């Protein structure tokens, strides 16, 4: 690797550390010509599948779009940044392990919804409302009821639909 300071071609690795998630290696290097030290990050480069949009056009996968979808769904929600990043990584991982050269955008949306469902139920319903083009309150109610049916039963678990109805009544009253 060329030294970023003097452009000399010979550098040596003096330390290597694997990141917490095991996906990146940080290498500390030293230039043999000028003695300057610098760090490099090494990751495996796997080609992600192309995304086939609903109109049939194809585009390269863009992780920023996935992140933007999470950000919109979770706006003003108390979800930790590291949890959102982990969810984005999970979507990317699902695409990588699919082994497909092309993936329909609808499948990416489903991956995002599955991660949101685990992360934040309100964010999940927000995303689902746009993704599935909800047209009225009945669509929201149906999705919330489906979500409640799938939740593990617990006396501590709040009833989503009941909470929504109670909030609606408070705002009207």
From Swiss-Prot:
Keywords: ATP-binding, DNA-binding, Metal-binding, Nucleotide-binding, Repressor, Transcription, Transcription regulation, Zinc, Zinc-finger
CC cofactor: Zn(2+)
Domain ATP-cone, chain residue ranges per copy: 49-139
Cofactor note: Binds 1 zinc ion.
InterPro entries: ATP-cone_dom, NrdR-like_N, RNR_NrdR-like
Record carries keyword Membrane: no
Gene Ontology MF annotations: ATP binding; DNA binding; zinc ion binding
Superkingdom to which the source organism belongs: Bacteria
The keyword DNA damage is assigned to this record: no
Biological processes per GO annotation: negative regulation of DNA-templated transcription
Zinc finger boundaries on the chain: unnamed: 3-34
PROSITE patterns cross-referenced by the UniProt entry: ATP_CONE (PS51161)
Family of this protein: Belongs to the NrdR family.
Free-text function comment from the UniProt entry: Negatively regulates transcription of bacterial ribonucleotide reductase nrd genes and operons by binding to NrdR-boxes.
Protein name (record): Transcriptional repressor NrdR
Source organism: Stenotrophomonas maltophilia (strain K279a)
